[in-house]
Amino acid sequence: MLRNGKDENAKLLFATISRVADDWYISFQLELQDLKHLTPAKNHGRVGVDLGVKQMVTLSDGHVFEAPKPLGKYLQKLKRLQRKMSRTKAKGSNRAKLGKVIARLHRRIADIRNDALHKVTNFIASNYSTVVIEDLNVKGMLKNHKLARCIADVGFGEFHRQLSYK
């Protein structure tokens, strides 16, 4: 990686600074010349991936990964905080404080979901050379009001995005 801003194998393209719920992050985009550090997948052949609501991912060889369902875990707390926030004065300091608490809770939910997705996609990408994934109409599935929250909580689109870049 870059040390003291210099490395022959990497070129810094740009950096992005972002703020999420009182936390600051910096993200670097580098262009690497030498890709020797990348390891090939352990060749276990091909695998088919089936996405679901109860079992987040089921592989054709029998591996099953359960969905963490972070929104379901924190939904009551989120509802209570949002109800409490709706009762505060419009531009008051208590409303701003509650907004930060709600933002932190949303971040925690997203972090749990992303962590589980990264673990599953990393396992698949590092163990299988060829991955076949079903093509789902997630937008159409979200129109079913009975399943929409569960489908959004699992994160099918993010799973597909992570698996494609890994």
Regions found by a protein language model. Name each.
Residues 4-8, 14-166:
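Positively charged, helix-rich recognition surfaces that bind polyanionic ligands
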